[in-house]
Swiss-Prot record:
Residues 234-304 form the KRAB domain. Belongs to the krueppel C2H2-type zinc-finger protein family. There is a cross-link at residue 28 (Glycyl lysine isopeptide (Lys-Gly) (interchain with G-Cter in SUMO1)). Residues 17-29 have a biased composition (Basic and acidic residues). InterPro entries: KRAB (IPR001909), KRAB_dom_sf (IPR036051), SCAN_dom (IPR003309), SCAN_sf (IPR038269), Znf_C2H2_sf (IPR036236), Znf_C2H2_type (IPR013087). It holds the Pfam family KRAB. GO terms for biological process: epigenetic programing of female pronucleus; negative regulation of gene expression via chromosomal CpG island methylation; regulation of transcription by RNA polymerase II. GO terms for molecular function: chromatin binding; double-stranded methylated DNA binding; zinc ion binding. It comes from Homo sapiens (Human). PROSITE patterns: KRAB (PS50805), SCAN_BOX (PS50804), ZINC_FINGER_C2H2_1 (PS00028), ZINC_FINGER_C2H2_2 (PS50157). This is Zinc finger protein 445. The lineage of its organism: Eukaryota, Metazoa, Chordata, Craniata, Vertebrata.
Length: 1031
């Protein structure tokens, strides 16, 4: 048989063959070593089930005045986007979808239904189906028994399609033409329609095919028109869209939510137009949970699919399907025939007699109430103890059960032990569908196993019995510890494959969850859900004390601590009369601002002892965190964690450098074997690089002029959060505390106001400068004492500030890096560039710099470029600090304030020059009143002049002992002290004398490292190096 004929003749087999081919392709890709998990394993086809779903939703959307035209138009655009998928499909594929839809719509009714049942994926496949059908009708004797669709592949169409299926069943073409055989759908479709959420029974939908006996209202005369039958079924099904469980799995969470919203909106619109009617089961399921609570695979009856079942067989198969399902609250329905007498449970009688009464009614009506009790188990009088033990959870021993219904209360089941099992409000509302009774029986059966000791489930590996299936599954997991899933990248093992899939996202950098509003991607669904709250503005966590709402639970907990701190401080006045534990004393001291622990070296105080131990690492140079890969040590855990991420990125780069997907990526433009770049975020305007994206965003505010932080007290804007916090502290200092220690109303600052006073009690004894904290005074005194507490452990060099030590230690780290890589990987780079302090060379003049930013600023001298431009007046500057100082003119901001006179200045250098006046005035006050400080200096200079009484050597020694006259030996004091021994020429400075002696000695100490030429002056060497750089 040709392939096209075979696909047309056996559409179900063709569809399942295509699915198996896709699964084999995906499995083959996973087994391949070059398979990249980042790429989606799901194939993109032209007619995916999700696309068909949203196509039907797009075509069947109804306009309603309550929604409004704008909302309806936006809903149509969203449905069309999910149907045509312009972000995935090409223009040709989108056109193919539109052409296929129009082609199917212009086909005759019988042909359209037949082609839709075969689910073609393109127009050519639909034409092939019609051509094969035409050949069969022209003269072949082959008869298609009908497409035996599997529930996982069959597409549940719209209400119009189901009406056409019903029409095709009653059509005379079934018996008079070969096309009728092709149009004959199997009975499983109608049974599945009923099980997928239809409120009518299959027998009610097919009255002519499956007549029932015993109920006069169920008989349908042959003369009854098909139009009347269709009018009875024209309800919510006309705008309803249903689908199989496999198709539901193809949809993501956004598509499922959109489907649920559209179905509920169509139901509300129909209810407002038609009037009140019975709520369909699909709507009930959508309001409760997902519409697919059933496994439709069990709905497929075995046997010959060609033979149409009778009404009894179909009812028996339906009952058997329902009884074999797990007890889900939203999955079962209770169907009662409209023509049968109402079945009810008598009040105050036993449940056993109630079921027997229902069994007797079965002889009169073949559609009894369906409950979760097997048909053969309804006759409880024939049950034995042995049978009950074998049946397990599916049997009910109703010996001690009474069905109670008290007027004004809910129904309940009562056990012999006195425990009641009541019907909840949700089940009570839907008790006419059988949910309430099923829920009571299910809960009662679980309780009954406790008394009877039934172990209805399987035995575990160790022989232990479990009464509940969930307990059995949990017990089996203890014996499957040996079965583990190992990560191929890092070797970590997991007990479940789903945990391994989540873990591998860390290596693949996959971000599968995307925000529907702004498009931002996330690695975890919880982070995406938390991010979407920003757009919706939902703040679910509300404080019951001040009614303030928060978006995150962590922020809510921090806010609750502020109330607890206020309460603790109120109780603090009674602290002497109460006995607290040491832990509470420590906690209360932390909240009240007490610093009980001091550092023995710098006298800095802290709240708790652990902070002191961490602080002392600065003095001891202890670095307890050591990297096992590069042997690098760190003082803080945060720096160690940030460093380990670099190794992870380097490992990820090495693993993927040979993959095709990463070869074409611009991120892999580095040479093979190169280490991971620490600074990966580049500023496009100034070229500065950063290690974090947040730091880059903060840096770009310099160019854009954005100031997102605004003070609520004075309205001033700030570009950085740190500057904003410092500014807010000034307002907190101005506020006066009321009634003892209290807290500011601002939640940003949770420190007592009493610690923010204008007093600066710590004063320097040498220069008179005052400070607020004692630690600041100790740091300041290093300027006078010359203390350098920060010492390099490798070379012994000492520094006054820790920042200078960190900058110096980079030299040693670069030296180690150069020793490891040698010069083979960087053959064109000189060793002194890697190991020296100045690593960045200017291509114009040959000058070197320690930082790349300084080099870029220096290049502006040659090019005349001024990169920093003011957005308000358009003035440009070559340095960033000059632009910042200039912008304060527009904002009238003067952040630098003199502590003596209160005068404010724009720049720090202006404040420094102003403070020198106060310093000179303070020194003049301490000096004798007869003469000023300048006169005193002149007098001391005159005393230190070299003369016959005081030789030159004694003059130099006296000058070196004076802290105020350090550079006196280089200042002209009337005589040139430095004399040349050869020619007798004298100079003011010794450096001038050394340079002069080179004329006599012909010394050329400056040598070019490239050509070997020597020079007497360094300026000549720098000028000579420019020639090599240009060449």
């Amino acid at each position: 048989m040709p392939p096209g004929r075979w696909h047309a003749a056996y559409p179900a087999q063709a569809q399942s063959s295509r699915e198996r081919g896709r699964l084999q392709t995906v499995k083959k890709e996973e087994e391949d070593e070059s398979y990249t998990p980042v790429q989606a394993a799901r194939p993109q086809t032209l007619n995916r089930p999700g696309q068909e779903l949203f196509r039907q939703l797009f075509r069947q959307l109804r306009y309603h005045e309550s929604s409004g035209p704008l909302e309806t138009l936006s809903r149509l655009r969203e449905l069309c986007r999910w149907w045509l998928r312009p972000d995935v499909l090409s223009k040709a594929q989108i056109l193919e979808l539109l052409v296929l839809e129009q082609f199917l719509s212009i086909l005759p009714g019988e042909l359209r239904v037949w082609v839709q049942l075969h689910n073609p994926e393109s127009g050519e496949e639909a034409v092939a189906l019609l051509e094969e059908l035409q050949r069969d009708l022209d003269g072949t004797s082959w008869r298609d028994p009908g497409p035996a669709q599997s529930p996982d592949v069959h597409w549940m169409g719209t209400g119009a399609l189901r009406s056409a299926q019903i029409w095709s069943l009653a059509s005379p073409l079934r018996s008079s033409s070969a096309l009728g055989d092709h149009l004959e759908p199997p009975y499983e479709i109608e049974a599945r329609d009923f099980l997928a959420g239809q409120s009518d029974t299959p027998a009610a939908q097919m009255p002519a095919l499956f007549p029932r006996e015993g109920c006069p209202g169920d008989q349908v005369t042959p003369t009854r028109s098909l139009t009347a039958q269709l009018q009875e079924t024209m309800t919510f099904k006309d705008v309803e869209v249903t689908f199989s469980q496999d198709e539901w799995g193809w949809l993501d969470s956004a598509q499922r939510n959109l489907y649920r919203d559209v179905m509920l909106e169509n139901y509300r619109n129909m209810a407002s137009l038609v009037g009140p009617f019975t709520k369909p089961a699909l709507i009930s399921w959508l309001e409760a949970r997902e519409p697919w609570g059933l496994n439709m695979q069990a709905a497929q009856p075995k046997g010959n699919p060609v033979a149409a079942p009778t009404g009894d067989d179909l009812q028996s198969k339906t009952n058997k399907f329902i009884l074999n399902q797990e007890p889900l609250e939203e999955a079962e329905t209770l169907a009662v025939s409209s023509g049968c007498p109402a079945t009810s449970v008598s009040e105050g009688i036993g449940l056993r007699e109630s079921f027997q009464q229902k069994s007797r009614q079965k002889d009169q009506c073949e559609n009894p109430i369906q409950v979760r009790v097997k048909k053969e188990e309804t006759n409880f009088s024939h049950r034995t103890g042995k049978d009950s033990e074998v049946s397990g959870s599916n049997s009910l021993d109703l010996k001690h059960v009474t069905y109670l219904r008290v007027s004004g209360r809910k129904e309940s089941l009562k056990h012999g032990c006195g425990k009641h099992f009541r019907m909840s409000s949700h089940h009570y509302d839907y008790k006419k569908y059988g949910k309430g009774l099923r829920h009571m029986i299910g809960g009662f059966s679980l309780h009954q196993r406790i008394h009877s000791g039934l172990k209805g489930n399987k035995k575990d590996v160790c022989g232990k019995d479990f009464s509940l299936s969930s307990h059995h599954q949990r017990g089996q997991s203890l014996h499957t510890v040996g079965v583990s899933f190992k990560c191929s990248d890092c070797g970590r093992t997991f007990s479940h494959s789903s945990h391994l899939a989540y873990h591998q996202r860390l290596h693949t950098q996959e971000k599968a969850f995307k925000c529907r509003v702004c498009g931002k991607a996330f690695r975890w669904s919880s982070n995406c859900a938390r991010h979407e709250k920003i757009h919706t503005g939902v703040k679910p966590y509300k404080c019951d004390l001040c009614e303030k709402a928060f978006r995150r639970l962590s922020a809510y907990r921090l806010h609750r601590e502020t109330h607890a701190k206020k309460k603790f401080l109120e109780l603090n006045q009674y602290r002497a009369a109460l006995t607290y534990s040491s832990g509470f004393d420590h906690h209360l001291g932390d909240q009240s601002g007490e610093k009980l622990f001091d550092c023995s070296q710098c006298r800095k105080s802290f709240h708790c002892k652990s902070y002191v131990l961490e602080h002392q690492r600065i003095h001891t140079q202890e670095k307890p965190y050591k990297c096992t890969k590069c042997r690098k040590t760190f003082r803080w855990r945060s720096n160690f964690t940030r460093h380990m991420r670099l190794h992870e990125e380097e490992k990820f780069y090495k693993q993927d450098e040979c993959r095709e997907g990463f070869r074409q990526s611009p991120d892999c433009s580095q040479p093979q074997g190169a280490p991971a770049v620490e600074k990966t975020f580049l500023c496009q305007q100034c070229g500065k690089t950063f290690t974090r994206k947040k730091t880059l965003v903060d840096h770009q505010r310099i160019h854009t002029g954005e100031k997102p932080y605004q003070c609520s007290d004075c309205g001033k804007d700030f570009a950085y959060r740190s500057a904003f916090i410092v500014h807010k502290k000034k307002h907190a200092m101005k506020r006066k505390p009321e009634g003892g220690p209290s807290f500011s109303q601002d939640t940003v600052f949770q420190v007592p106001q009493s610690s923010h006073s204008k007093e600066e009690p710590y004063k320097c004894s040498q220069c008179g400068k005052a400070f607020r904290n004692h630690s600041f005074l100790l740091i300041h005194q290093r300027v006078h004492t010359g203390e350098k507490p920060y010492k390099c452990r490798e070379c012994g060099k000492a520094f006054r500030w820790s920042s200078n030590l960190y900058r110096h230690q980079r030299i040693h780290s670069l030296q180690k890096q150069y020793d490891c890589h040698e010069s083979e990987k960087t053959p064109n780079v000189e060793p002194k560039i890697l190991t020296g302090e100045k690593r960045f060379w200017c291509q114009e003049c040959g000058k070197t710099f320690t930082r790349k930013r300084t080099l870029l600023d220096h290049k502006g001298i040659h090019s005349g470029e001024k990169r920093y431009k003011c957005n308000l007046c358009g003035k440009s500057y070559d340095r960033n600090y000059r632009l910042v100082n200039h912008q304060r003119i527009h904002s009238t901001e003067r952040p630098f304030k003199c502590q003596w006179c209160g005068k404010e200045f724009i720049g720090r250098h202006t404040l420094s020059s102003h403070q020198r006046k106060h310093t000179r005035a303070a020194q003049a006050e301490r000096s004798p009143p007869a003469r000023s400080s300048s006169q005193d200096t002149k007098l001391r200079l005159q005393k230190l002049k070299p003369s016959e009484e005081m030789p030159l050597e004694d003059c130099k020694e006296a000058c070196s002992q004076s802290s105020r006259l350090t550079g006196l030996q280089d200042i002209s004091i009337g005589k040139k002290c430095h004399k040349c021994s050869i020619c007798g020429k004298t100079f003011n400075k010794s450096s001038q004398l050394i340079s002069h002696k080179r004329f006599h000695t012909r010394e050329r100490p400056f040598k070019c490292s490239k050509c070997g030429k020597t020079f007497r002056w360094s300026s000549n060497l720098a000028r000579h190096m420019k020639n090599h750089i240009r060449d």
